């Protein structure tokens, strides 16, 4: 009998990258609301080739499991030469510190979106852009990556 799993990208990345038992990410209602506002503002300022809140899903078959993975990429930048998944992160801590401490989680999440987009559009290579925005300062930092399907 085939076992079926339905997972969000968030659930998958949390499970795969879980280490220890302390989660040092900062979550509170005020910070989350401000993050939502910053995401929407940032997305509204992007060019017409920027697809905000892009819904993705893919089915994977592993052993006797059917896994449906789904999630919503913050943005997809559609270019002729390279599609780029934009993952936006807002924080109240130093951007370099935040990136260094959370890079594996952020890249893992973006890689899932990139793979699903590549499968949907039959692409061999997809770019990833991690966009970090400070919630109280006017600071932004961008990290770029390129991945190919293997």
Predicted feature residues:
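Metal-dependent nuclease catalytic cores that hydrolyze phosphodiester bonds in DNA/RNA
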Residues: 1-82, 108
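Mg2+/Mn2+-dependent nuclease catalytic core
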Residues: 60-150
């Amino acid at each position: 009998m085939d076992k079926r799993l339905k997972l969000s990208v968030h659930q998958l990345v949390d499970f795969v990258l879980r280490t220890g038992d302390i989660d040092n990410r900062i979550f509170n209602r005020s910070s989350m609301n401000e993050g939502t506002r910053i995401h929407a503002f940032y997305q509204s300022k992007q060019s017409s080739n920027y697809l905000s809140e892009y819904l993705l899903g893919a089915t994977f078959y592993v052993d006797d499991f059917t896994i449906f993975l789904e999630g919503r990429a913050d943005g997809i930048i559609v270019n002729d030469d390279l599609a780029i998944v934009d993952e936006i992160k807002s924080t109240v801590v130093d951007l370099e510190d935040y990136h260094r401490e959370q890079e594996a989680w952020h890249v893992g999440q973006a890689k899932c979106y990139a793979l699903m987009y590549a499968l949907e559009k039959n692409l061999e290579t997809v770019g990833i852009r991690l966009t970090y925005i400070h919630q109280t300062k006017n600071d932004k930092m961008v990290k770029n990556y390129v991945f190919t399907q293997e």
